Amino acid sequence: GASGRNGGMLPPRYKKGYAAIAKRYGNDVSRRLHGLMLEAVDTVEAIVEDCDIDCDFHRSGQLTAAHSSEHLRSLEADRDWMASEAGDKAARILDRHQTMDEVGGGSHVGGWLDPRGAGIHPLNYTRGLATALLARGVEIYGRTPVLRLVEEPASVRVETPRGSIRARHAVIATNAYTDATGFAPGKLDRRIVAINTSVIATRPLSANVAATELPARRMVADTKHIMNWYRITPDNCVIFGGRGDITGRSDNPGVYAMLERQIVETFPQIGEARIGQRWSGKIAV
């Protein structure tokens, strides 16, 4: 799930924040997670370069837009923790006016900016990975659902409708659909939670409007409990995501109408820009 569905944002920060993670789990755990998050973005960049994948990877920076003074103080605590406990001083705090300059609208009181955040075209990245793997001799079987994983003394047996495969290791990369597999009860329970998300995308904006609304082309997410996130694509479409239908419906017009109101509130100059695409589905957190 989400291989081609998500917004293609690679943030170097968790929504919870490193200071909050450290308070609950300790500095060592938070430092490890901090390193893993930075490594993840670096790894994707290295794969894109090594495999020559055309997927619009670019480090335009990640902006977390605070919706309250309390949220801004939390971002400031995160910046301070990173500097003192991880020796990382890359991120900086923006005031209200600096944040407005970055976003062009909305009601943010400030923000967090990390230049290491990146954007990517997720479906083209997935296709590029498949092409690179096939070129290296990897066999990919589509339309072959895994029915069962059986752990054996020295291997794992993967059972499918077309036969079984034995391997030393099996990677369960099922994202939001892990609960449906039943592969590893107890091992993955409550570690991966599926949520429904909905996304809209405008038709291409004029160069002038695009330069006004997201001039630095940041990857942006806000700090609301049910957050909105947004970015601009290389062809000047704004992708804007948020909460999906709680029942899992992918065609709820009320959800899309809500997103259309929110995108205009965030980007007033977009006005009645036509929406070119709408989609919904599950992603994992």
Segment roles from a protein language model:
Residues 1, 42, 50-59, 146-148, ...:
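Active-site substrate-recognition segment that forms the wall
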Residues 91-95, 139-141, 274-278:
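General small-molecule cofactor/ligand-binding pocket signal
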Residues 13-97:
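Dinucleotide-binding Rossmann-like beta1-alpha1 core, especially the glycine-rich loop
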